[in-house]
């Protein structure tokens, strides 16, 4: 196994959401500290990997957490939790990547704010240096502005006279024709009733109406054909079938975040399709009541090797008994040939020569002396 494949809740401690480490811990087995694999629940409502708790119960029949007596026959599968853990395991690297991206972006924002503050402080220094020059320029421009203001005042008087005339006309029109003017319920503009019942309501509802100018209001009424807008007309049910909605239109638009989460994420199979297991669990043998020949016959029936001593054959059966029954607890069981391959690898590890503490110290003596010499030299 590659070291990069090893996960730990502390991976989230350096991200933008360090609290996700607690969520990661809840999805791990208390015995192996890895993400739950084929989780089962004990009678005391604690959850472990099926293989982990079965191997533990071979040595001790008490719960590792609360020390309550636990029986292997009372283990209950948790298929929903297994699918949740599988989904979380597939999303975990993408989640870490997204949180790391946000962390980098927030760091860039801090750098931009810092540079903006520095430029603002430099700008304040330049402003202080230019105050005297600005005062001199203003003194010179004041004389020119006095001449311009005289001309603008004369022009402003003419504009004010024209504006006063328009406002007075509008106010007179509102006072004299207040009985004939009505207010639009959409834009609250006052107008004649026939104008309101014409195209104005439709234009207001569709957003096409424009602001009426004083010229339009003050102009004499043109003879218009009396029309009733569709707003006041009774609705007629034509009973025309609506076109079927295409699936593409109802599909939500994918965002960069959802695209990243969907990339390389395989959706697990439904729980209902994977909870059916045809195999039967293997029984736990009482080796004290079985002869060596019967043990060999049991191994032969399971297509397992019958070589080695009696103790080796008993250990072989017990380990296969654990991984076989744990495989039945999984939503995604593997073939028996793969289980036999796992058993073979396990036996190879068990037959490796043991490396004691004394031998390890002797082999590493040279390295220890070199490290001590480096520490003293520093």
From Swiss-Prot:
Gene3D superfamilies cross-referenced by the UniProt entry: Classic Zinc Finger, Zinc/RING finger domain, C3HC4 (zinc finger)
Zinc fingers (UBZ4-type) by residue: 181-209
GO-annotated molecular function: single-stranded DNA binding; ubiquitin protein ligase activity; zinc ion binding
Cited SMART domains: RING (SM00184), SAP (SM00513), ZnF_Rad18 (SM00734)
Transmembrane feature ranges: none
Keyword annotations of the record: DNA damage, DNA repair, DNA-binding, Metal-binding, Nucleus, Transferase, Ubl conjugation pathway, Zinc, Zinc-finger
EC number from the UniProt entry: 2.3.2.27
The protein's role, per its UniProt record: E3 RING-finger protein, member of the UBC2/RAD6 epistasis group. Associates to the E2 ubiquitin conjugating enzyme UBC2/RAD6 to form the UBC2-RAD18 ubiquitin ligase complex involved in postreplicative repair (PRR) of damaged DNA.
Quaternary organization: Interacts with E2 UBC2, forming a complex with ubiquitin ligase activity.
Protein's recorded name: Postreplication repair E3 ubiquitin-protein ligase RAD18
Organism expressing this protein natively: Candida albicans (strain SC5314 / ATCC MYA-2876) (Yeast)
């Amino acid at each position: 196994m590659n070291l990069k494949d090893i996960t730990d809740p502390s991976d989230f401690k350096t991200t933008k959401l360090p609290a996700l480490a607690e969520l990661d811990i809840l999805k791990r087995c208390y015995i192996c500290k890895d993400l739950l694999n084929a989780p089962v629940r004990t009678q005391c409502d604690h959850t472990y990997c099926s293989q982990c708790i079965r191997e533990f119960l071979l040595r001790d029949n008490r719960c590792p957490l609360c020390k309550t007596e636990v029986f292997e026959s009372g283990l209950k599968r948790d298929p929903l939790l297994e699918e949740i853990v599988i989904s979380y395991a597939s999303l975990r690297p993408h989640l870490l990547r997204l949180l790391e991206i946000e962390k980098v972006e927030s760091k860039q924002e801090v750098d931009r704010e810092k540079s903006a503050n520095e430029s603002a402080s430099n700008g304040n220094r330049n402003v202080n240096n230019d105050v005297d020059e600005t005062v001199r320029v203003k003194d010179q421009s004041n004389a020119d502005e006095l001449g311009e203001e005289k001309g603008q005042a004369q022009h402003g008087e003419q504009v004010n006279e024209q504006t006063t005339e328009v406002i007075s006309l509008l106010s007179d029109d509102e006072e004299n024709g207040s009985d004939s003017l009505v207010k639009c319920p959409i834009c609250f503009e006052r107008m004649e009733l026939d104008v309101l019942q014409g195209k104005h309501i439709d234009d207001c509802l569709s957003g096409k109406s424009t602001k009426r100018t004083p010229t339009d209001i003050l102009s004499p009424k043109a003879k218009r054909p009396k029309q009733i807008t569709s707003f006041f007309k009774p609705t007629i049910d034509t009973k025309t079938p609506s076109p079927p909605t295409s699936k593409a239109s109802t599909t939500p638009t994918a965002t960069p975040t959802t695209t990243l989460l969907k990339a390389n994420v395989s959706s697990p199979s439904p729980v209902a399709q994977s909870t059916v297991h045809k195999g039967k669990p293997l029984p736990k043998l009482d080796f004290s009541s079985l002869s060596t020949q019967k043990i060999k016959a049991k191994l032969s029936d399971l297509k397992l090797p019958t070589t080695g001593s009696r103790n080796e054959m008993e250990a072989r059966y017990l380990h296969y008994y654990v991984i076989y029954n744990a495989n039945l607890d999984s939503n995604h069981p593997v073939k028996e040939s793969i289980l036999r391959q796992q058993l073979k690898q396990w036996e190879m590890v068990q037959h490796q020569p043991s490396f004691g503490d004394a031998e390890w110290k002797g082999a590493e003596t040279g390295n220890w002396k070199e490290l001590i010499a480096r520490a003293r030299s520093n």
